[in-house]
Amino acid sequence: MNYSTALPDFIEMQRVSFCWFIAQGLNDELTMFSRIHDFSYNTEYRLFGQEYSLVKPVYTIVRAKKLAANYSVQLVIPLEVRNKKLNSVRYFGQFTIINLPLMTTTATFVINGCERVIVSQIIRSPGIYFEKNKNHRKRKQFKSQVLGHASKLGSFLPSGVPWIIPYDQPWKPWIIGKKLGYSKYNSNKDTKLDFYFYSLKSFKIYQKISKITNSPIKVQRIKLFLQWLKLNQKEFNFKNKLNLSELSFLLNYWNFIFKFIIKYQFLYKKNFEESYQIQESEFKTIFKTWNNQPQLNDSFSLKKIDQLTSNYEKKIQFYHNVIQQQFFDNLMLVPFITKEKKILNLESLANRQKQKKISLTLLTNESIKFAFYFSPSLKEVFKYRSPKKRKPKEAKIKQPILYLRSPSKIVQFKDDHQVLDSYKKKYDTKDFYTATLIPESGSWIRFGFQKNTKINRYQYPIRHQEDEVIIQIDKITQKPILYLLKEMGLTDWEICSNLKHADFFYFTKPFLTGSLTSKQPLPRFDLHSDYYKNISEFSHIFDARYYRLGKIGRFQINNRLNLKLNNRIYTITYEDIFAILDCLVTLSISKTTGDDIDHLKNRRVRSVGELLQNLFRVGFQRLVRKLGSQINKRESGQISSFNIIGATVREFFGSSQLSQYMDQTNPLSSLTHRRRISGLGPGGLDRDRISFAVRDIHPSHYGRICPIETPEGPNVGLIASLTTCARVNKLGFIETPFWRVINGKVIKTGNPIYLTADIEDFYKIAPADISTNSKNYLTQNLIPVRYKQDFITVSPFQVDFISISPIQVVSVATSLIPFFEHDDANRALMGSNMQRQSVPLMLSQKPIVGTGLENQIAIDSGMTINAQGAGIVHSVTADYIIVKEYSGRKLKYILQKYQRSNQETCINHRPIVWKGEKIKSGQILTDGPGITNNELALGQNVLVAYMPWQGYNFEDAILINERLVYEDVFTSIHIERYDIEIEQDDDVSEQITKNIPNLSFSEIQNLNDDGIVALGTFVKPGDILVGKIIAKNDSEQLPEAKLLRAIFGAKAKGVRDTSFRMPKGKYGRVVDRVTFNRKTKLAYKFEKIQVFIAQIRKIKVGDKIAGRHGNKGIISRILPRQDMPFLPDGTPVDIILNPLGVPSRMNVGQLYECLLGIAGHKLNRRFKILPFDEMYGPEVSRILINKKLRQASIENDEAWLFNPYSPGKMVLIDGRTGKEFENPITVGNAYMLKLIHLVDDKMHARATGPYSLITQQPLGGKAQHGGQRFGEMEVWALEGFGAAFTLKELLTIKSDDMQGRNETLNAIVKGQLIPKSGVPESFKVLLQELRSIGLDMSTYKIENYNLNQHYELEVDLIETYDSLEKTFPPTSNLDDISF
């Protein structure tokens, strides 16, 4: 078994992160903002961040909770304020910058007396991401037939120098069609070479070949092709023995040989005459070599070009004759002269092709062969020649044909044809991708392809360029990337030489120099020169103040782009941009999938420490802005500006999405809350606009993020939980442990190896439920493994790693579910979520069937008191434990007694050690809520039967035995806090007192002299908690009372009773009172009083209970125990569940659990069951349960426990009749939880109560004592039945007809008929709102004279009434208007 019992500390992530912040993160931020200037730069604030100190907290944790204060430390830094003009120090001293909330040992923060948790956030990691563009419209091909065929010429024709045809050849110039012009070429002396003829001839031959579409087309094409290549020589008869592959090989290398001969002139040496060699000295006049690149010399004159050109043309004529003689007589093997003078055959040619093409061939004896006429360099030279057009002699041109939309010819130069051809082959069918660069700070930068129909400054192979690469820093601002690089000072030559796919951006290889006269400066990019700052906003991307990749961003970019830059370079560099462009083009050609943004290698966790560090950065940035904008403020005022940092921190802890009120329902919920990972929050995802892909489970989540535990509803998949063994590394990536497997043996010595998601993809990893023998060798022949996010089977020798535990995959809450591999995932999700909602019971039990994690969850939950050091217990009481450590010091541990948790459950510690007991460090000293004897115990083991009972368990309802009520099986304690504010201002002055007029003695007997209820009092609804009175004003008194006071001169004014009473439906016992005093020297006055009331809640109809497998239900009836079905030994069943709740929900784990539970109950034994036990054999769970049931049956001599024909089913007897039920029934001990959805908190009734001020409709909700809304769908139901009068009542007197409802109340009290209803208030509000937008609506009353005549009378519905009291004047003429 590959199970590791020592799981890591469950809240280590939070604690380690906060400690890192205090030790290093805070220091980094203080160092970054060590010098701050005011607006005039005269005053400098200097923070000595390295010397900061933390002052001990004012309040302890317990006291901070009691007094609703913060548990925080003062951050003190030496501050120096210096006047730079006078060079004098105005202020120097220890300055308290902020009160920093301090983390408790249980990884929580106490803010305003409440425990809060900072949830870790999972966000996209800084780095570079490539994704495929969706819905990108592919450009339409230009459908001219000529153009289409011409573009394919390159694959068939030799793309060498175009043929120069001597005039005396037997075939005369070609004539194609009537409309096409024709040309004959005879002149060798013209500098402008006309290759029109070549184009036509090539096209004609190609068309002939392409028409052959029948069966042996390949052979025929090649045959025709070779025939044409022979020109007019005797037909080339190849032997039939050559197969197709040899022929195609021959054809492919034909082009290559041809180019080779002409371009590099590997011919016999004797054929070269001295006149055709150019001395190196002459070469130097044209070119100078710089950095291994040919570069034009500025002094090179145009006359030399003419001379060279004429030389060239003589040479071409000479070469043509040589080719005729040498090449066609010896086709297969052409003798080449190399330095070694060896014969080069076709195979070595294949290797030759892979070498880079060079534009100049330097040979020995200091002479250079003329090989650069068509190199890019000379082509550039020709551009600068004056255009001198001379018609060729003896050439006739009729109607020149435009093959392309632009007037360029199909083939201009040898390189053009070659590059265009390779460009199309390489890039024509490319896909479009976008690269997104996410820095640590700064906006995202996008690189992508964009259509641009303008001809660009730099030369492109296609004139109408549609695939320009642009850089974009926001939705509007964008620019072609090459423009940006040129603006930043790079030359074309540098850009080209740094790009792997330079041919995508540059048609020909650019020169280093831009012109013949002026020298181009080399790029010297200096960020601090003002010129570059003013170029454009894009220059900011190289500036660390605006764009900062950070440590993680640099690490990710280096990994993704295979760069070897130093990890401390936190800015974007040219190398990054070149690598991004290369990667974009490579992806476009290869059409591979883009990056998976949901992969955990591309997402990282920001924990408490990093969130606080970012918070300090934001605070200091606000401070810098504030000091920079303040003018002529006093020094003290400017120093007080530092409060803005404290305000930032308070704002984060108080109202951030990631700072949450801690879930303290039970120990499990509080532990899970601290291990939660949220995708929401600042910088995270937006819940409303998120896709399903982001919420989905990803293969890389394995062992890192739990696939089961996530909330139901809108946050599903966005909020997750760490798995049991996962941890977060220094860079924020989640790691999970594995054992190494070498040659089929699991190596378990030392610690397991932690792997991140990106490394894991390269190894074959086996799951934990693979059986091993005693020597740790894998025993199966075929083992299922994960490899590169796929699932394959391999032999044991190919396995690299194996998971350490079967529960490594799931979170802490899910790992508590036994047999969860038999449950459907949705039900397991509900099970793990509902365990977090279970209320700690007064008498809880450990589960009979557990999973073995209960002890560690109890230790790490923070709800118990753990020993800080080893020693011997000195004394134990209910309130404290004193431990004498071996070092001699005595430690006093104070226990919490009946404290209120955030969810109003009860936190109470009970000691479980005895005087004189030896204890170890970290051992649990007390039980806490939901913890019994060192183990988590959230519920009770109760006897359940799966059977229907009179319809009382229809649709998940639950029937329970009254034993659960009387024996306090599901009884819990809840503590509520009531805050009573004492108002003290100029108008109103409240006093608290016991002397309240007009009250009986029984009503005030439980108040003390201050008027506060005494401890231990049992209070019911309406009882006074705090007695308060307020003096009446004169205006409030009746006239006769004023008269009497004036006559008899009464000294005391009347007082009004404003005492705080228990709300309706609430009861309990007063367990604590806390008073808060005003900070006044004059008198001892209370400001606020808190009263804590504990109530014992037994289980009742309407409460929600659930199992651990997502089987939840509401209690529908509590049956007397004598009516419950009972077992043959007389034990009545505690709970009856509906058997139909199992098959459709597919949570069969509950049956396994309850059957093993009854076996354990009878055997007096508890079981720890790990999931995924199929490694020991098929159906092991079922076999184990049958064995244990049989064993229990034998040991207890109770044969009815195990029936081999229907194992797990027992005979039940009906408690009402005493007869057996017809069929055996599944009975067992299930572990059931009482959930916090209690009926006491939800039950609510209202007769009359408060109304909304404007619409005058009743308020909603229990807290406002509101009514029950009769909503839209309920109205449809009444409309469907035509219940008109019921509807009318609901719309008027039961809702917002103010006058009508008062009159109705009077009528009901007096027993009179209910009067007609009036106009609803909301209708009047609608009228007023329509008037506010300029629509004047009037209401009219229709009066009938007789059947045919009537007249209309306008009625003003908006009566004048006292707006404060909203009461009508007594005279109203609306009696007869009805709605």
Swiss-Prot record:
It is found in: Plastid, Chloroplast. It comes from the Eukaryota. Its main location: plastid. Its EC number is 2.7.7.6. It catalyses: RNA(n) + a ribonucleoside 5'-triphosphate = RNA(n+1) + diphosphate. Pfam families: RNA_pol_Rpb2_1 (PF04563), RNA_pol_Rpb2_2 (PF04561), RNA_pol_Rpb2_3 (PF04565), RNA_pol_Rpb2_45 (PF10385), RNA_pol_Rpb2_6 (PF00562), RNA_pol_Rpb2_7 (PF04560). One of its GO terms (biological process) is DNA-templated transcription. GO terms for cellular component: chloroplast; DNA-directed RNA polymerase complex; mitochondrion. It is an enzyme of class 2 (transferase). Keywords: Chloroplast, DNA-directed RNA polymerase, Nucleotidyltransferase, Plastid, Transcription, Transferase. One of its GO terms (molecular function) is DNA-directed RNA polymerase activity. Belongs to the RNA polymerase beta chain family. DNA-dependent RNA polymerase catalyzes the transcription of DNA into RNA using the four ribonucleoside triphosphates as substrates. PANTHER family: DNA-DIRECTED RNA POLYMERASE I SUBUNIT 2. In plastids the minimal PEP RNA polymerase catalytic core is composed of four subunits: alpha, beta, beta', and beta''. When a (nuclear-encoded) sigma factor is associated with the core the holoenzyme is formed, which can initiate transcription. This is DNA-directed RNA polymerase subunit beta. It comes from Trieres chinensis (Marine centric diatom). The lineage of its organism: Eukaryota, Sar, Stramenopiles, Ochrophyta, Bacillariophyta.
